């Protein structure tokens, strides 16, 4: 809190937690659990003049799962970040600040339009652009590894979406068999993605003054 007081609370077997908040204070709530990335949110009682129950729910990301950043999009054959892509990268930056001991791989994928070599180069430039932005807002470059894989890793559908079933692998041959153009384009959109996953959890930040 803004008093500098630290309050620890463990969840019960349903994942619920509770503690009393003092008036006229702002709180920073940090949650952690083995196998998941730390997550932080803020809440405040400043300006609250009556009793109130605050409900603060957390959705935690598993360390071992590859996380897709859905808002990161690019113009065709470009690697410049669109304005709305910045929001996802800003959220990723906050996650890295909450988890200073992790090193992540930031991976960019393309669709099957164009040839393999150009798609590989394009995806690497896109991954590099994401890393460059994160470094520009204060993330330690040693926490970031940029990888462009081109079209080598087709997306696997996780949840049924119209004609796409859970487990469908969106390979080039699969997409060619799709009858309707709008569904083919949707498959390409699934393949065009940027994601990250945790490589290490033992990084020690360099705190030496330069």
Where are these regions (language model features)?
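A short, solvent-exposed beta-strand micro-motif common in secreted/extracellular proteins
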Residues: 15, 23-36
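Extracellular beta-sheet/turn segments enriched in Thr/Pro/Gly and aliphatic residues
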Residues: 39-72
């Amino acid at each position: 809190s803004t008093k500098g007081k630290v309050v620890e609370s463990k969840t019960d077997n349903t994942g619920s937690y509770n503690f009393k908040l003092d008036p006229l204070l702002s709180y920073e709530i940090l949650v952690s659990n083995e196998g998941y990335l730390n997550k932080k949110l803020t809440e405040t009682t400043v300006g609250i003049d009556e009793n109130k129950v605050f409900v603060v729910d957390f959705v935690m990301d598993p360390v071992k799962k590859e996380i897709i950043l859905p808002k990161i999009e690019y113009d065709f054959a470009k690697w410049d970040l669109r304005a709305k892509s910045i929001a996802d990268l800003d959220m990723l930056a906050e996650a890295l600040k909450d988890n200073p001991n992790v090193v992540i791989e930031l991976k960019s994928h393309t669709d099957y339009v164009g040839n393999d070599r150009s798609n590989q180069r394009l995806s690497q430039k896109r991954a590099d652009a994401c890393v460059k932005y994160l470094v520009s807002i204060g993330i330690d470059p040693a926490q970031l590894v940029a990888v462009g894989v081109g079209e080598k890793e087709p997306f696997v559908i996780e949840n049924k979406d119209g004609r796409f079933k859970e487990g469908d692998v969106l390979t080039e041959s699969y997409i060619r068999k799709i009858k309707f153009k709008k569904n083919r384009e949707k498959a390409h959109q699934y393949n065009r993605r940027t994601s990250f996953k945790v490589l290490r959890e033992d990084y020690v930040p360099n705190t030496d003054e330069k």
